[in-house]
Amino acid sequence: MRFRHPDGSTVHLAYCTNVHPAETLDGVLAQLRDHCEPVRRRLGRDRLGIGLWLAKDAARALVTDPAALRGLRCELERRGLEVVTLNGFPYEGFGSEEVKYRVYTPDWADPERLEHTAALARVLAGLLPDDVTEGSISTLPLAWRTAYDDGRAETARTALRTLAERLDALEDLTGRSIRVALEPEPGCVVETTRDAIAPLTAVGHDRIGICVDTCHLATSFEEPATALDDLAQAGVPVIKSQLSAALHAEQPHLPEVREALAAFAEPRFLHQTRTATSAGLRGTDDLDEALAGDALPDAGPWRSHFHVPLHAAPAAPLTSTLPVLTSVLTRLVGGPHPLTRHLEVETYTWQALPPELRPRGRAQLADGIAAELTLARDLLTDLGLKELP
């Protein structure tokens, strides 16, 4: 979906396909047929943006076989789909029964992360629509925080500088500008937008910036205006924003709230949980840890890294951080010029929701994704953007 900003620039809205992950190219093609095109049809649009997640095997198949890449591009066009952004965070296995900490490997101190991201950039350059010259890729925020020392930090910094050089060369070759964005996430070396400033300014290249995930920002209790102002003052570009909402519990000390939260403690994904105290942010690596005894202070609200559907907040006594998303979006695209032109709805946890909230089959999932995109579209038009055909 494309929108015209009042300044005349085009803002792209997509949804991320990691909600129905596929490990192979054949799986990606099936995904377009079974999921993405049905969402487009529900929206009644001739064109729908998708943020592709390409696992390592799918990416390698595309980067080593020009015919396969052309075939994917043709299939996208045939189904009324377009790609201007990729989710390069998970490397493989995102559809596994247990993902948890595995999603953080390989990290940016491992040469394979550089090679995978460079391959994604080459693929994206070949998938961009003819009238689009800029693409974006979101990626791991350096590494999970443990066992990350000065030596690994220097290796990661060197890898990002090397990537920037390769992206320069890619534009010289293809005429397509691809940029890569670190996506701050609770528990990682770069947990917040403020944490991103030092490593990104150390890299010192405008092709390497930040992806603002509104669920992650909310989970860390960041104030949107302050976070985005700090990035602007530091000269860190917002390359992409993922529109998502976290799980919010206003009164976590109450037994009924604990019971409601427990329904979201599931074995597949990591649900980092945070609370803001007078001594600073406190947290646990997972929701079940927070619910166990007194691992986390409960005098104030808790927020958990569980991407809940944008249009359907959990029932009381829980809610979502949708107001934070709205504030971030207002700051990003509600001003005289957009701070980013790539927006991606990312709710990958539909099948991890409590059983009674999960979609039953492909049709209900497509309905839900279409409803999320409709909400995002309405937020954008309320900010003065006009949807393009």
Residue ranges of predicted features:
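Hydrophobic faces of well-ordered beta-strands that scaffold small-molecule active sites
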Residues: 11-18, 46-52, 83-88, 133-139, ...
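Flexible, acidic glycine-rich loops studded with aromatic residues
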Residues: 287-385
